[in-house]
Regions:
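Membrane-active, amphipathic/fusogenic segments and juxtamembrane/transmembrane anchors
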Residues: 2-156, 220-245, 291-293, 303, ...
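Hydrophobic, Leu/Ile/Phe/Ala-enriched alpha-helical segments that form helix-helix packing faces
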Residues: 24-35, 130-138, 197-208, 254-265
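Short glycine-rich, low-complexity/disordered patches
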Residues: 36-44, 140-151, 202-217, 261-281
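Membrane-inserting effector segments that mediate pore formation, membrane fusion
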Residues: 139-211
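Amphipathic, membrane-active segments
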Residues: 188-257
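A long, low-hydrophobicity, low-complexity, charged/polar interaction segment common
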Residues: 227-307
Length: 330
């Protein structure tokens, strides 16, 4: 199913952000000619599997003074199921575009990046105060982004560098693997894990004092690339739950689940696990492949399909996966 619409204009929006015509033209070029394509997502919620893909765009006049980015987006209708080791998975893919999703391509950052949405702070100054406080204590980069929504639930993103992911995997490995890699790598991995845990704990605890709306669940996203992207997401109102979800035993369980998924679906580009607070464990949600196929649990697909029906019927908050970035580094 193809939907046509306007993704952005050069008018000043509700967040007091004005996008230049040149930026719209670059976005159109990237959508048409780029190696990846933006996903169509619901309410900027990464835990809901992508329901479509933006595959064509152009810039045209919007009124006498402004311009608009017109897009064509496909809402996926090619859906099938497969049974692997007794588990049912839903397979969703495009009929018109086989590029990977833009959200599945992350930069090779030199430092760990902590990112958050400026709208989830009382003021721009408070956002800078929070992020600069972390940067003063830890050797990291910080980033602010802007989701085009009124006041979305708070979100904190931790993007690890590749070496950190490697060392973390070593730290979580079995005794036999540890003995093979040697003491130097093991010591480095242990120190890396300790430093990472200290940063995450501080960021989560400090964030609970700054983020708004209060008493709303915070989405904590931990992602990094090592051959493919690993994405772990905790959504909770309790900061201690997010910290507990990252202890060594639970992370080991998460990596074991990912290894099993990788054996079943070897062409993974990104794999996402969600922490189930009620059952105190990590659960597979969905994965994406090199050709833009989405494979998820039956539960995750049904949730996405139901929300898509509601939002498409009501012309709701259907978004591309590209957020406006307001600062690379403060």
């Amino acid at each position: 199913m193809i939907y046509k619409g306007i993704a952005a204009t050069t008018k000043v929006d509700a967040h007091n952000i004005r996008i230049a015509k040149e930026a719209l033209e670059q976005a159109a070029h990237d959508i048409n000619e780029g190696k990846c394509a933006p996903a169509v997502v619901i309410e900027h919620d990464l835990t809901i599997l992508p329901i479509g893909k933006v595959y064509k765009a152009f810039v045209d006049s919007f009124d006498e003074e402004d311009y608009a980015l017109h897009i064509e987006q496909e809402i996926f209708e090619n859906v099938s199921s497969t049974i692997v080791n007794g588990e049912k998975y839903m397979v969703v893919k495009s009929d018109v575009d086989d590029r990977p999703f833009a959200s599945d391509i992350i930069s090779n950052n030199e430092k760990l990046i902590v990112g958050t949405d400026s709208v989830n702070f009382e003021s721009d100054e408070k956002a800078k105060e929070y992020l600069n406080g972390l940067r003063a204590e830890f050797d990291i980069d910080v980033q602010r982004f802007c989701r085009k929504s009124v006041i979305p639930d708070p979100e904190l993103v931790f993007q690890l560098v590749e070496n950190s992911v490697k060392y973390l995997l070593i730290y979580l490995c079995s005794k036999q693997v540890v003995e093979r890699v040697g003491d130097v790598l093991v010591d480095t991995a242990v120190n890396e894990a300790k430093n990472l845990y200290a940063l995450v704990k501080k960021a989560i605890k400090a964030g609970s004092k700054y983020l708004i709306p209060e008493n709303r669940p915070v989405t904590y996203i931990f992602k990094g690339s090592f051959n493919y992207i690993i994405e772990l997401i905790v959504k909770t109102t309790n900061p201690d739950v997010a910290i507990s979800a990252l202890n060594k035993e639970k992370l080991k369980e998460a990596i074991d689940k990912i290894d099993n998924i990788k054996e079943q679906f070897p062409k993974i580009l990104r794999v996402q696990l969600i922490y189930n607070e009620n059952e105190d464990k990590w659960e597979f949600n969905y994965l994406t492949t090199e050709v833009g196929v989405v494979i998820g649990t039956e539960q995750s697909y049904k949730k996405a399909a139901k929300l898509a029906e509601i939002y498409l019927g009501n012309s709701g908050d259907i978004n591309t996966d590209a957020s406006t970035q307001t600062d690379d580094v403060l």
